[in-house]
Amino acid sequence: MTIARREFLKATSAAAGATALSRALGEHLEASQRPEDVRITDARYRPLADYPIQPLPFSEVRLTDTFWKPKVDVNAAVTIPLEVRKFVDGERGFGGNILEAAILSLKTHPNPTLQAQVDAQIRSTAQSAGRGNSGFEVAATLFNVTGRRELLDRAIAAADALYEEFTKTNPPFSGGERDAINCVQLYRMTHDKKHLDLAKHYLDIRGLENSVNRSRHNQSYKPVLEQREAVGHAVNCASLMVSLTDVGVLTGLKPYLTAAQAMWTDAVTRKMYITGGIGTTGNEGFGKAYALPNLSAYAETCAVLMFATLNHRLFLATGDGKYIDVMERGIYNNALSGVSAGGDRFFYVNRLASAGDGRDLRWERASLECCPPNLVRFLAAMPGLVYAQGPAGAVYVNLYVSSESTYAIGAAGRLSLAVQSEMPWGGKSTITVSAAPGVKSSIKLRIPGWARNQAVPGGLYSYAVKVATEATVAVNGTRMSAAPDAFGYVSLDRVWKNGDVIEVDFPVTPRRVVADARVKDAGNRVSVERGPIVYCAEWPDVDTGKALELLVDPDSPLEAASDPKLFGGVTTIRTRARAIGHPSAPPGRVTLVPYYLWANRGAGEMSVWLRTREYAPGDVGPAGGLIFYVNPDYATDKWRYLEAAPFDQSAGAKWGCFRRQIAGARGTAVGTGQQNTRDMLAACPDPGTAAALCASLNVNGVGGWFLPSRDELTLLYRNLTATRVADFGEAGRADNFSYWASSQLTADMAAHVDFADLGRQHFDDKDFPRRVRAIRAF
């Protein structure tokens, strides 16, 4: 029997009961062990107790800060009920991530109305027929958090049936990375080896020669243990890395963990945005190495959340703080950008620049099962990322968040910590021992990479200038060494006493960040960050409203200032900048705001990466195309640059107006293409012609494109194809490697430039199909 992925990935309707899988599940349910016979672990919430280092459960961390606690509270009071209401109103019921988020949130934020909705949904799920998956992860969470097992027995039976089916028939299958994670979750409670074996099986059958749908997009192009690149769908790739890590840790088979770490390294050192986001392409996937466009960035909210899960797991497996560095960057920036300040609007994608055309406003979409449900689940459990405990009882302080927590030390000892932290707006944190175990124990303080002059591990991004200020650590007023170990931690080992005080101070001065030179979209640009927070320029804080056209003074001071009126009080950064293309204009003051807060004040331009010099031919332009001309007469013409679109508009379009002499469209010089295009459209507005294709173009929210004149097109060839020929047509092919210009010769003929013939200018019939590449002036 071939088992379709959806039959067990997703809870299905009663109609699924007719499938062979559902019949198998039904038979197994009848023959399965009774609940009291199934061996289950203690219901105390210890979701990753099988890792070398274990997180302190979210419900055992009491947040007291003014940054994360309000967000977790809004999530509980506004966002989760909103998501539940969407699905209930749609008569679909709610399950999966939303149900899991609600279960988690109710543990720390009781809500009678939400509790009643959760109870009703659990009853409905438990009683429904033909549910192939039965929600392994939800069942695990429900039992772990509450001890309730209404969904657990069905999940166990489903897993057992799947195990039997796969081991009997071993059908060709592309593999299920999330199914592997879910099976591991189930195994953590049952300790039934076949559930772990099923998780491993999902990985082992992936990418085999007889696997169906083998491709790089679904990470099945080769066996998983041979994969070393982060490729394909970003969420699924991160999920695959999580499942590899889980299986590697639980089985002790190092190749699984090695594969996950190699893929992580590829993502972080070549394919990650400065905001911690991953995924650059419209198919929700990883792009080529160092191809990190800003206006068309994907950086899906779901992807950064799964990547945060991966980074947390890799830390728990290895103790290496570099994984927390990357996790911290992602959750403070990309993840929080995914939800509005009010908790009721969402981003699916998180671009690093916006043209302000309105497409980058957060939305409230009904019944979307992807990003919002994942985000509410993340926020509900976020406190579980703050601390961890090693096998010898060492306490890891990973995130500096005002909070209270308690740890078991030895047979009966307890260590309680009360943290007061200024983070992320200030660098000072005070950790007070409020209960001591009476025996020697270790507290490990993470020294973030950004406090050690390291923007990200691997050097994809680095600070333009290193600062001499270092982190400081003191215990009871006595200065201690703040030099971290190889994993980024300072270990304080002693017999702690009640009232002992640890003081930590990190430099949180604003810093300019530059990207690896191979990241073309960040060339001659800087981003600005302070501590873990990445900043951006947004339209309300720019005099002209043109955040995409800012040129910042690279020598201007970066001044941090608290703004109590902005979203309840955040730290902004002030610097000096001027409009690009106006070198004689004096720089003015501009205020940068935290990236995660952008698009909360209406539609308008935004940019994370800010220019530090004027454009030159070959630079990536504001619309993501290529600059190919700098106009020396900008004061007269009112434009400074010509930018070529980043892709062809057609591989074979007609010029139009064949055998028709139109008024105008005769300009050949630089600066005449835009008027030529207007003349062409006025005379022959037929869709699909070269001029119409250019005029209707919108690239990443940027319009104003036109068909270049003959001399403009010749300049484009001369200034770009020497180094960027692959960006035009099919490099190396001589057939139809010629582009239309907007310059008319006669009623029958118009100019074109042959890119396969050294850029020679020719004239040909307007009715002949040729390539089209739009340009724009700004």
Question: Predicted regions: what is each one?
Answer:
Residues E36-V38, V72, A199, A260, ...:
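C-terminal beta-rich recognition modules with glycine/proline-rich loops and embedded aromatic residues
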Residues D37-P112, G132-T146, R154, G176-K194, ...:
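Aromatic (Trp/Tyr) and acidic
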Residues I98, P112-S134, G207, K271-T280:
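Helix-terminus loop motifs that line ligand-binding clefts
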Residues Y615, P632, P687-T689, G703-G704, ...:
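C-terminal, surface-exposed recognition/capping segments
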Residues Y615-V699, F737, M749-H752, K766-I775:
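Extracellular adhesion/carbohydrate-recognition regions
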